[in-house]
Amino acid sequence: MRLSSFIVVGAAVVNLLTSGSVVVAAFPRVSDVSAMAIAPHRMDQGATNGGKRLLRYHSNNNRGGDEDIAEERGIFDFKNLEMLTNLARLNKANNLDSRLDDFFQALIKAKVNPTNIHHTRLDQDDYLELRQLFRTWYTFYHRAS
């Protein structure tokens, strides 16, 4: 075959490919196919997994986690927190007032620690000293007692 024939055939192929009519007709768009193929699968999977999860949460009414446990025990009473914050300003972590020690022990029983304390009502700026004292006590003195 001559060089001119290769050029003509190549130009025709390039023209067909760039126009897109042959490509679109021959191959459907990949995104349409994958979206149609995956969507029903995701719905079925979500319905079965989500359904079990919803049933489990509805059966024990425990969606909120640590804050709900702490609130059920009455740990976050406003007047009590205000008094404890004032005590936190006056106490050191190595020599706690018994009320602060009891409060910190109640926080631990409610599965509150320095890394998840921001999920409780103690995340407000008013309780900064109380959070800092709890963090120091938890880090250095909790395990010793």
Swiss-Prot record:
Pfam short name (any one): RXLR
Keyword DNA repair belongs to the record: no
Endpoints of the signal sequence: 1-21
Keywords: Secreted, Signal, Virulence
Tree of life domain: Eukaryota
Function summary: Secreted effector that impairs both plant effector-triggered immunity and pathogen-associated molecular patterns (PAMP)-triggered immunity (PTI). Suppresses plant cell death as a part of the plant defense responses. Facilitates plant infection by altering the auxin content at the roots penetration points of the of the pathogen.
Record comment regarding domains: The RxLR-dEER motif acts to carry the protein into the host cell cytoplasm through binding to cell surface phosphatidylinositol-3-phosphate.
Family, similarity comment: Belongs to the RxLR effector family.
Full protein name: Secreted RxLR effector protein PSE1
Gene that encodes the chain: PSE1
